[in-house]
Amino acid sequence: MIIRRTLQHIELFAGIGGFRTAMDILGRDKIARFKHVGYSEIDRKAVQTYCANYDTENEVVMGDIVHFTESVERIGKLPNFDLLTGGFPCQTFSMMGHQRGFDDERGLMFFRIMDIVRVKHPPYILLENVKNLYTHDKRRTFTRIVEELKAAGYNVVYDIFNTQDFCLPQTRNRVLIFATLEPLPNNFIFSSKAVKECFEFNKSRMSVRQSDTVIGILEKNVPDKYMLSERIKPTLLADGSAGFKSKSEINQLIARPLTASMHKMHRACQDNYYSLDFIASD
């Protein structure tokens, strides 16, 4: 599957533009070409950041996707586009949450994607979510998602990817779902291994910052406000207490996943802590 034309792109659940940034890097490095024609995001501050980072003039501002998809006519008026991307809300599938899946309103956002897909029929779809989506509810949730896409006429492939395999030194597993209206060649492979091989082949001509370990990323001069106090340090670095046992480790070359509750300062078995000596090393 070789695509040489400019692809029209719409980004759903855009946040501050994760997919868009990737598309822009591919364009900058002359690997692929994209034109962004619209985006949806409900968080006001995320939208402010998105508009500050990108030139969104003449793009469709879809806003709240629930409200937007209430009108088939409104969906139909979207400009035609080739690629739909979206990291739909993951809290209802995450191992860190209650895992209510489709029983939570946020878990139903996938079906708002399908509302757009059934009207606009974009040739390509790329969706992202937490690894646990793949196994949630004994895989019934994931199977439903794949079946919905197939029922809309799409060929669907998927795999689980880890950021540390792509020169981003953090353990962060995500399931990526690729769907296309085009027939897939018999030799088409969509897997973490195949994509990693493609990345390795192209990375020398990619301008994105790359690092195999956190040493290449951590700032050398760290403000005092980020230092652990002597009072809290023994607790955070301890291997456990009466009701909680753990193996606390600092100076991880590959960072642990970031969590929404990390600001609460978990123990060193969960969060990422680094010594000044480690930061200063090469």
Give the role of each language-model region:
Residues 85-87:
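Non-cysteine beta-strand/loop elements that form the S-adenosyl-L-methionine
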Residues 71-81, 91-281:
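Class I S-adenosyl-L-methionine
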Residues 7-66:
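SAM cofactor-binding core of SAM-dependent methyltransferases
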Residues 5, 32-35, 154, 173:
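Residue-level signal for beta-strand positions within conserved beta-sheet cores that form or flank
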Residues 3, 31-33, 53, 78, ...:
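Alpha-helix termination/capping residues and helix-transition junctions
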Residues 1-7:
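Extreme N-terminus of proteins, especially the signal/transit-peptide cleavage junction
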Residues 6, 36, 58-59, 82, ...:
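The start of beta-strands in P-loop NTPase/AAA+ ATPase cores
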